[in-house]
Each structure stands twice: as structure tokens, then as C-alpha cells.
Amino acid sequence: MKIEKLSTDILIIGGGTAGCYAALTISENSDKKVLICEKAHIKRSGCLAAGVNALNAYIVDGRKPQDYVDYAKKDADGIVREDLLLTMSEKLNEVTDRLEKLGLVILKDENGKYVTRGNRNLKINGENIKPILASAVEQAKNVEILNRVNIIDFAVKENKINGAYGIGIENDTFYIIKAKAVIVATGGAAGLYKPN
């Protein structure tokens, strides 16, 4: 097994939707060097790998961000940070608009308004949501991608995470990655509690 040492400003562990979106946001707002490590391939990884038929987090006309917070709090039986949910909820529609600009097909009615489904959902043709995000990430100026690299542990010095260790699944390589910051985007925590 060969050893490869890498250095980056920001390491993102996980190349699903959240990891890709984080990389895009960082790339568009800074010149920081970003490295995504994904155990599969960012084109079809994460919980949206196969696509979806709706965006289930959108503030539809007549609703406000607090409504989404209330829904999520009830759904999680109160185990939430309301302040974080509110901050996220205030940006949901902005993220949706951005995904549409990247090429995601969002269904619209005859007046050009998004077709909604319920109180917080939009109908989409989302089978290509991950390939669309992957393409945008691949074109980002300061983002490098390591597909098929499984991160196995954090690199820690003096109680501070300063990188990670990974194994190339297909290339027999052990990666030692130094990073000034690490974002863990390895998946949601859904299903940790009893459904209500």
C-alpha cells in the first residue's frame, strides 16, 4: 500500500448533497482550497443518489420559516435546536432557486409558479439532482475531489482535529490529509428516535 500526503484548507468528509453544496458555497465565497473525500462517487452518492420527486423543505406561499421549524420539532419529538432550524429554514428557498439555476427541473404551473405538494414540498424531476451538483463541484475553481476514498479516522493533535486518514478503495493508497478545518457531511441522523 502506498502512502500519499495531502494538505488543504477545508476537508469535507462525504460527497453527498450536503458535502457537495458545502463545497460549492465555499468555492463561490472564498479562495480556500477544498478537498472532498467520498467513499463512493459524488455523482451518485448519499441519500439522494437515485434522485427524488420532491423537495421536502420549501417555504410555500402563505407559510413562514417558523412553520418549518414547528413541523421539524414535532416530527423529531422535540429533539432539535430550534435556533439552527430557523437559520436553515430562512435559507431553504434560496437554496432551491440556486439548484434550479444549476439545472434542476422544478415543475411549474401555467403561471410560472412552482407546483407545490402540501405545506412544504415542491414537485421536481429530481433523478439528476446529484449529477447536477457533482458537475457544478467538478467545475469549481478551488475544489478537489477524491472519489472512492473511505475516511477511517480523524487526525488529532493537542485535542484539535487537523485532518483525517483515509484508504483508497480502488487504488491501494493510504491518505494522510492535513486540513485547517474539517466538515463532516456523512449523512443525516434520521431514524434515531421512535416515529411519532
Model-derived features: positions:
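Short, well-ordered coil/turn residues at beta-beta hairpins
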Residues: G14, A179, A185-T186
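Conserved N-terminal/central alpha/beta ligand/cofactor-binding core
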Residues: K2, K32-K33, K39-G168, T173, ...
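Core beta-strand elements of the Rossmann-like FAD/NAD(P) dinucleotide-binding domain
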Residues: K5-T8, N171-A181
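N-terminal Rossmann-like FAD-binding beta1-loop-alpha1 element of flavoenzymes
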Residues: D9-I36
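Hydrophobic/aromatic ligand-binding patch that stacks against planar heteroaromatic rings
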Residues: Y21, T25-I26, G46-C47, V182
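Conserved structured core elements
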Residues: C20, E127, I176-I177
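Short, solvent-exposed loop/turn segments at secondary-structure boundaries
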Residues: K194-N196
